[in-house]
Structure formats: C-alpha cells, structure tokens
Regions:
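Intrinsically disordered, low-complexity Ser/Thr-rich linker and spacer segments
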Residues: 104-110, 204, 305-307
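Amphipathic alpha-helical protein-interaction segments
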Residues: 2-194, 212-220, 256
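General N-terminal targeting signals
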Residues: 63, 103, 149, 189, ...
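Short secondary-structure transition/capping segments
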Residues: 95-97, 118, 160-164, 201-203, ...
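Interaction modules related to DNA damage response and DNA replication/repair
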Residues: 209-308
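Non-catalytic propeptide/linker segments at domain boundaries
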Residues: 193-207
C-alpha cells in the first residue's frame, strides 16, 4: 500500500520543498514570463531598468538549477539581453518555446488562473522601468478588452475600472499616469527598484495610512510572511494590545473593524491562495459598505510601537 504524501509547510504556510505543487508553480513561472515579455515588448524598447528586471526574473527563478526547460529559457533570455532589444522574431520564438513547454511538458495552464498569471506578468513588465508610456497603456487596454471573464473579477476589474475613468476624455495627464502606475505596481507587487527582486514581494492593497488606529477590541487578521518576525509573534502583539485574532475574513461575522495586516513577502501563488483570497474578500466587503481596513507590515509595526 502506498502512503499518501503530504506537503511539509513551514509556520508561514509555505512549502519547504520545491517538489510541492511543482508542475503548477512551473506553469505559473512560465505564464508570468510570457506576460513580462509582452509587457516589456509593448514599447519595442528594452530600457536599462527593464533589462535589470528581466535578468532579476531569471536569476531569482527557483527552478534554474534543476530543470532543463528553464536552462533553455535562460539561454533565450540571455540572447534577448545581449543587444538590449526584444525583436518581433525573438518574442515569437520565445513565446512559442514557452507555449511548447506548457503543451508538451504535461503542465496545466490553469485556465482562469493562467490568464491572471499572464496579466500579472504583463503588469510587472510594463511597470519595470517605473514609467508608463502611451503604447503600454494602449496595449493594457486591449489586453483587458479581450477577456470579459477576466475583467469581471479581481484584480483585473480594479484595473479596468481605473483605466476606463482615465481614458474617458481621451487624454492621459501626468497625474493619471502616475495614479495608474501606482495601482499596477500595487497589484503586481512590483518592487524592483526597492528590493532588486522580480517577484516575491507582497502586492500592497493598503486602504489606510492612518498612523493612530486603536487596536483594543478590534478583530485583526494576518496574511503573508512577515519580515519582522513570525506570524505567531505578530498575533501575540495583537493580543497584548487588546485585539482579537481571527484566522479568516468571514462575511457573516459581526465586524465593526477588521484590520487585515499584509506581510511583506507573499507565497509564490499568493493571488490564488489564502493571501489573495483574504485580500479579495476584504475589497469586496468594502465595496458593500463594510468598515474593514487593510494595512501593510510597515504600518502595522508603527502601530504596535505607537500603541505600546
């Protein structure tokens, strides 16, 4: 009789071995790269920062030492980086290779999940150089207009709503461009300039920057991996400040205020695991008029210090 295998998770709920859900994570990495390449290629020019971003994706990839497919991918990425330009032929060759790996490598593209991974990769690509040109905005609008199912759900619906407002008068001013860039970076977790990482940092959906939130009697829910200590340590801080710790965001709960604290490092699959689901739930409840706040780890640490 064969024993059923179980994934070994650390205390943050993250898999301790790469074998856990390997095919799904491999497909995610490939779909994300497809989106990144589309995003970077949108303006036909590879800037210095975009080159750094693409190289960071390659160097941070957890599969590169053991997987032949990723060795091939890395070689083609290096060819693209060599002259600083992504030509149409290079893009077609690269995208075809990535699609072949998905098709013939017995990998699932995830359906809707795969579409979102591609979108997040695209958002990372167009925001890698910390600017948005008209060509990139136009291509984003076209991408969102292609899939009604995609834009009916978070996070694409949030981008579509903001983009429609910006494009309503046919003019994108500097303020609107900056606003859209901030939203894109928040959703994709883009933090290359701050961290040097192509992925892995949390998307920041903070709903408040208020530095004086009284935690006494409040219900606090944590998600993500924290740079300032384990989740258990964060929960102990919350309890010491008179808050109630909740494991999930529950609609039926009689919530006055629930503070969802985002850890600074997210799971490889954050948008499809409890991390992303909790964010989606809170944003949905806020649209329904519920008084729920989301704060990031930086603000959480300031609150605990302040209230101590």
């Amino acid at each position: 009789m064969t024993a059923k295998s179980t994934a070994v998770l650390d205390h943050h709920g993250q898999p301790q071995t790469l074998a856990f859900n390997y095919k799904r994570n491999k497909a995610k990495a490939i779909l994300t790269l497809k989106g990144i390449l589309d995003g970077i290629h949108a303006d036909k020019h590879l800037s210095e920062l975009e080159e750094v971003y693409l190289r960071a994706w390659k160097d941070n990839d957890v599969f590169n030492l053991t997987d032949g497919d990723f060795i091939d991918i890395h070689e083609q990425v290096e060819d693209i980086l060599e002259d600083g330009v992504i030509t149409t032929s290079e893009l077609i060759d690269m995208q075809q290779m990535l699609q072949d790996i998905l098709n013939y490598g017995d990998l699932e593209d995830g359906g809707y999940e795969g579409t979102v991974n591609h979108l997040l990769g695209f958002l990372s690509g167009i925001s890698a150089d910390d600017t948005l040109c008209d060509a990139e905005i136009e291509k984003l609008a076209k991408l969102l207009s292609k899939d009604k199912h995609l834009v009916s759900k978070w996070p694409a619906n949030a981008i579509k709503k903001r983009l429609d407002m910006i494009l309503e008068d046919g003019i994108v001013d500097d303020s609107e461009r900056c606003d859209l860039l901030s939203l894109i970076k928040a959703i994709s977790g883009q933090s290359l300039l701050e961290t040097g990482l192509a992925y892995g940092m949390s998307a920041d959906f903070s709903t408040t920057q208020e530095g004086r939130i009284c935690l006494k009697g409040k219900q606090v829910c944590f998600t993500g991996k924290f740079l300032s200590g384990s989740r258990k340590i964060q929960e102990q801080k919350a309890l010491s400040l008179g808050a109630q710790v909740k494991g999930n965001v529950v609609k039926g709960l009689d919530i006055l205020v629930l503070v969802l604290v985002l850890g600074a490092v997210a799971s490889r699959d954050w948008q499809f695991t409890s991390y992303g689901r909790k964010i989606e739930s809170v944003l949905t409840y806020r649209e329904e008029g519920r008084k729920i706040e989301i704060i990031n780890e930086e603000l959480w640490n300031a609150l605990t210090v302040c209230d101590d």
